[in-house]
Amino acid sequence: MTVGTILVTGAFGQVGKRCTQILLERGRTVIATDLRTGKTVAAQAELSAGAGALIPTYIDLLDAEAVREVVVTHRPEAIIHLAAIVSPPSYRNPGLARRVNVGGTENLLAAAASLPGPPLFLMASSAAVYGSRNPYRYPERITPETAVNPIDQYGEDKVLAEEAIRASGLPHALLRLGGVVSPDTRLDGDYLLLIRATPGDNRIHAVDARDVALAFANGVDREATLAGKVLLIAGNESYVKLQRDLEDDMMAGVGLGRLGPSASLPGDPTDDRGWAFTGWFDTTEAQQLLDFQEHDWHQTVAWIAESQGHLRAVLRALGPILRPVMLTVLKLQRRAEGRGPYADPWTLIAKKYGSGALAAAD
């Protein structure tokens, strides 16, 4: 069945704007919701210049009445729910993140459930639901059946949102995303801390934001095969990486060059809480159902590199000077933070943001 009208939350973000563009190019009507900022308005203007029927709607998902009005007015046949306060920014205000990530989802579900024809509800969940993944204890791939065990508040938010969706009675699919990569990622202090906290030998399964967008766009017409499923969204085998290798590939791509193993601390093989919330996905079923893996890792790196423009040439020239300086700074930061021989990411994150950044203790 071809779905004509789709509501997309977070429609002007790194995945949302690309998903919206695909849907518009396919002749669909897209109710594009987001918060009004300079970036979202610019993305709206770019999308409005193309084909398809774009209906931009700036609302806060915490405003239940506004959400209901949009849903009841436009009666979407499918909802793609991408909006969230993601980690690490969520660590700064976990209370607000919980209200948006869980409460906002509940508002959207309540509005959708009031429609005479229930829409298909596709939600962007996260690898964060699986928590710390010690590859020495759990060498196998993550599958849709792998038990959730969040270690941070963001993963806990996603688990709670998933539970609300299951309880809603709406036809749905939960798309748990790997490490989404695009030129839109802003490497501010929070992201740099998360990168430094992550063990260099931590497993990470990356995915191009364009492929994530395609997965959601393809999903809206496939309710019969998707409903009730958990699907793991990550790239093909070229995206199966260790954290240090991924970072160095990106740094080489933008011109700085590789920092090497000494830029990261390793994970502790004996500590199940000493690893980040990423692992390697078994994407077999998701790829069969959604047919979304169109890019290879080298294409994603090239995309990032091209986005740097003339800065790439400058970084390439300065790389031999900058690399040893960066390694020295990283070493001094670790010493100042009192870090030991292992990365121990969640101790560092709790020290920086407080215990609210972590999932509630059992």
Positions of predicted regions on the chain:
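N-terminal Rossmann NAD(P)H-binding glycine-rich loop of SDR-like oxidoreductase domains
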Residues: 4-26
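NAD(P)H-binding glycine-rich loop region in Rossmannoid oxidoreductase-like domains
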Residues: 58-100
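Short alpha-helical oligomerization interface
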Residues: 89-104, 142-150
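Conserved Rossmann-fold NAD(P)-dependent oxidoreductase catalytic core, especially the SDR/UDP-sugar
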Residues: 106-153, 173
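Conserved beta-loop-beta element that borders a ligand/cofactor-binding pocket
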Residues: 126, 159-184
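Substrate-positioning beta->alpha
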Residues: 198-221, 229
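Mid/C-terminal beta-alpha module of Rossmann-like enzyme folds, strongest
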Residues: 215-289, 295-303, 308-319, 326-362
